[in-house]
UniProtKB/Swiss-Prot annotation:
Protein name: Large ribosomal subunit protein uL3
Listed PANTHER family: 50S RIBOSOMAL PROTEIN L3 (PTHR11229), LARGE RIBOSOMAL SUBUNIT PROTEIN UL3C (PTHR11229:SF16)
Highest classification ranks of the organism: Bacteria, Bacillati, Actinomycetota, Actinomycetes, Mycobacteriales
Keyword terms of this UniProt record: Ribonucleoprotein, Ribosomal protein, RNA-binding, rRNA-binding
GO BP terms, alphabetized: translation
Length: 218
């Protein structure tokens, strides 16, 4: 469900640090370089069947952009950008093609949802990937310390059920962390200081938008 209050911006995760609040307490924050984003297209109910704004972010060599995508940027009157996403909104009247969005779309104390790609861990076992306890370290255990154990009976069920937690590739998943507080907006430097941790590595792309479950707090 869309909401007229929903705002959003693309940015880059710079890393974590700590700051002090007005009560002199330490607050762990993640620093996000937010924008600048540019509006490249506006979707409307009449023409597209839904309301949304298309945001573009990040520099890219124009020679690396194919012709159809280059044409879309040319139509919007902006230079090509590396990342393009759509933000669903109920009211597009606040946006216009070519408009630039910065960190100032949010205010101090706003609640946001942050989406990013988690760090890739490669092939991982069940203890790391799913938190399995493993087996005994002694008392007769031999070369089974980190094994998962049984994955199904021989005759019944005679197969491995779908969804069985096993070893495999871990990380590099799209993850959204909800209801994080914007501790401070540094408009001069285009930074968002978000309380707590957010998904992804340093330098990774993140999408910051108004909290879906934030209610009046957002």
């Amino acid at each position: 469900m869309t909401d007229t209050k929903i705002k959003g911006i693309l940015g880059t995760k710079l890393g974590m640090t700590q700051v002090f609040d007005e009560n002199n307490r330490v607050v762990p924050v993640t620093v996000v370089k937010a924008g600048p984003n540019v509006v490249t297209q506006i979707r409307t109910e009449e023409r597209d069947g839904y309301s949304a704004v298309q945001l573009a972010f990040g520099a890219i060599d124009p020679r690396k952009v194919n012709k159809p995508t280059s044409g879309q940027f040319a139509k919007a009157g902006v230079t090509p950008r590396r990342h393009v996403v759509e933000l669903r909104v109920a009211d597009t009247s606040e946006y216009e093609v070519g408009q630039e969005l910065t960190a100032e779309v949010f205010e101090d104390g706003a609640y946001v949802d942050v989406t990013g790609t988690s760090k890739g861990k490669g092939f991982a076992g069940t203890m790391k990937r799913h938190g399995f306890a493993g087996q005994g370290a002694s008392h007769g255990a031999q070369a089974v310390h980190r094994r998962p154990g049984s994955i199904g009976g021989c005759a019944t069920p005679g197969r491995v059920f779908k969804g069985m937690r096993m070893s495999g590739r871990m990380g590099s998943d799209r993850i959204t962390t909800q209801n994080l507080s914007v501790h401070k907006v540094d408009a001069e430097n285009g930074l968002l200081l978000i309380k707590g941790a957010i998904p992804g590595r340093k330098g990774g792309l993140v999408i910051v938008k108004s909290a879906v479950k934030g209610g009046a707090r957002a």
